[in-house]
């Protein structure tokens, strides 16, 4: 009989493994989260696990340390770079690697765009078995200081000397101890330390979890999420800060509907689309594109691809405050904008009036995630569609178009421009439009809306005979 092994000597599956040499891996590609991807080999020379290595780049030979192990893959961080990639560059930000705001600063900008283009192509092929007839040239813009919208977390952390204001640490709920940010506009980056001092002096320093910022053409708005009312001393501090830093404060005591301007009251946010003579007022909680410079180029490309004429009726789905609707109205007979938010629909109508295009526009509030073929038929015939959905994509719209095509009951637009912030849902919807609704994927390309991050914005053109 074998001798029983004492409980204290038995190996636990969670027991720490004795340290040994870090394994070596050849990195073949990047995934959608900007992690290096490699594959181990078995003793028989067969492909083994897929390893996702944070901080590694394609073409590199690295050692790594795994922090999560699954039967078919592991997640790891890079330990040492034995052979660096020619694409590797020195991150500009001191806090890169700790702060979760960026994930690709170590990758050359041209390579970043190339990686995103490949992510788009791979998604179209693997998820929809599609290849675009043409790959559009990428849309480029500023690499730094471009982020005109951000949500900053506020924490009073005694161990770190007081109040922190910034993005979350990478893969953590902790707030990064950051004193500057290279992707925020310089004047906002320079405000991070003064903001810390401001919050330190408020009576509700422990009851203000978040600051949302929105940068307009002439003013920067800061929305303070306040869980308790501010007192007179707080009000005085906010007014003094606003005067010194030329910002406008808004207060949000509860949900988004409770956001109200505090000080000063005689300024307002807007952005412009000079190519089309459009000025777009907005509130700091309205959805607007993060990168205003790229947005201008994106709107121009979308309209050139859609090619509206004075005879066209155009349907703009997920229209928001009218970012595409109003420029389209300059060039079309009629544009109808549909949005799921009543607040944004109201704002879009007001913007159309302010820009003198309300005679060519109509707006409606509808749940586009539940739209059907009958719903689209009820809107009447449209020559062209522009679709700009959130990350969830436009599945119901795509299914509705497929149903109309297959039933033969109802008109279909001859051209669709689809602007996407998620290549996976774009590929899914493209599969429906091509394989079930009879469209051709004429072209697709990336829009580098979020430099130094792994987010992939793209634009695609569909046509139907």
Swiss-Prot record:
E.C. numbers: 2.1.1.190
Cystine pairs: none
CDD domains: AdoMet_MTases
Biological processes per GO annotation: rRNA base methylation
Organism: Burkholderia cenocepacia (strain HI2424)
Any Pfam family: tRNA_U5-meth_tr
Protein name (database record): 23S rRNA (uracil(1939)-C(5))-methyltransferase RlmD
Positions with a binding annotation for S-adenosyl-L-methionine: 289, 318, 323, 339, 367, 388
UniProt catalytic activity: uridine(1939) in 23S rRNA + S-adenosyl-L-methionine = 5-methyluridine(1939) in 23S rRNA + S-adenosyl-L-homocysteine + H(+)
Region (Disordered): 1-22
PROSITE patterns: SAM_MT_RNA_M5U, TRAM
Highest taxon of source: Bacteria
InterPro entries: 23S_rRNA_MeTrfase_RlmD, NA-bd_OB-fold, SAM-dependent_MTases_sf, TRAM_dom, U5_MeTrfase_fam
Binding site for [4Fe-4S] cluster: 93, 99, 102, 181
Statement: the UniProt record of this protein carries the keyword Iron-sulfur: yes
Key words, A-Z: 4Fe-4S, Iron, Iron-sulfur, Metal-binding, Methyltransferase, rRNA processing, S-adenosyl-L-methionine, Transferase
Protein task: Catalyzes the formation of 5-methyl-uridine at position 1939 (m5U1939) in 23S rRNA.
Active site positions, chain numbering: 421
Assigned protein family: Belongs to the class I-like SAM-binding methyltransferase superfamily. RNA M5U methyltransferase family. RlmD subfamily.
Keyword Cytoplasm: no
Lineage of the organism: Bacteria, Pseudomonadati, Pseudomonadota, Betaproteobacteria, Burkholderiales
């Amino acid at each position: 009989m074998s001798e029983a092994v004492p409980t204290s000597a038995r190996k636990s599956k969670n027991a720490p493994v004795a340290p040994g040499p870090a394994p070596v891996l050849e990195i073949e590609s990047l995934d959608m989260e900007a992690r290096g991807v490699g594959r181990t080999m078995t003793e028989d020379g067969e492909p083994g696990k897929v390893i996702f290595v944070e901080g590694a780049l394609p073409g590199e030979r690295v050692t790594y340390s795994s922090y999560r192990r699954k039967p078919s893959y592991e997640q790891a961080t890079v330990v040492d770079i034995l052979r660096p990639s020619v694409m590797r560059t020195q991150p500009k930000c001191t806090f890169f690697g700790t702060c979760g705001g960026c994930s690709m600063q170590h990758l050359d900008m041209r390579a970043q765009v190339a990686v995103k283009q490949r992510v788009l192509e791979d998604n179209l092929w693997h998820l929809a078995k599609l290849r675009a007839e043409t790959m559009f040239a990428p849309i480029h813009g500023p690499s730094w200081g471009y982020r005109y919208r951000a949500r900053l977390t506020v924490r009073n952390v005694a161990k770190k000397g007081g109040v922190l204001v910034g993005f979350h640490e990478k893969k953590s709920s902790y707030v990064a101890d950051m004193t500057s940010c290279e992707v925020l506009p310089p004047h906002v980056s320079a405000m991070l330390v003064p903001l810390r001092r401001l919050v330190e002096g408020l009576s509700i320093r422990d009851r203000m979890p978040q600051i949302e910022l929105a940068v307009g053409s002439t003013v920067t708005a800061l929305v303070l999420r306040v869980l308790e009312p501010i007192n007179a001393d707080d009000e005085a501090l906010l007014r003094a800060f606003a005067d010194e830093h030329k910002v406008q404060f808004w207060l949000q005591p509860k949900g988004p509907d409770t956001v109200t301007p505090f000080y000063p009251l005689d300024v307002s946010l807007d952005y412009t689309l000079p190519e089309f003579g459009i000025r777009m007022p907005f509130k700091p909680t309205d959805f607007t594109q993060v990168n205003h410079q790229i947005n201008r180029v994106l709107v121009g490309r979308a309209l050139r691809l859609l090619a509206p004429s004075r005879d066209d009726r155009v349907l703009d789905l997920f229209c928001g405050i009218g970012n595409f609707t109003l420029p389209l109205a300059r060039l079309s007979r009629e544009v109808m904008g549909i949005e799921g938010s009543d607040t944004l629909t109201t704002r879009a109508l007001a913007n159309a009036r302010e820009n003198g295009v309300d005679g060519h526009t109509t707006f409606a509030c509808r749940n586009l995630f539940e739209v059907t073929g009958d719903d689209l038929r009820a809107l009447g015939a449209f020559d062209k569609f522009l679709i700009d959905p959130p990350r969830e994509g436009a599945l119901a719209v795509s299914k509705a178009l497929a149903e109309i095509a297959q039933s033969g009951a109802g008109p279909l637009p001859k051209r669709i421009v689809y602007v996407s912030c998620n290549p996976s849902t774009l590929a899914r919807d493209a599969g429906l439009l091509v394989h079930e609704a009879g469209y051709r994927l004429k072209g697709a390309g990336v829009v580098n809306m979020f430099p130094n991050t792994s987010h992939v914005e793209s634009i695609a053109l569909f046509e139907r005979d």
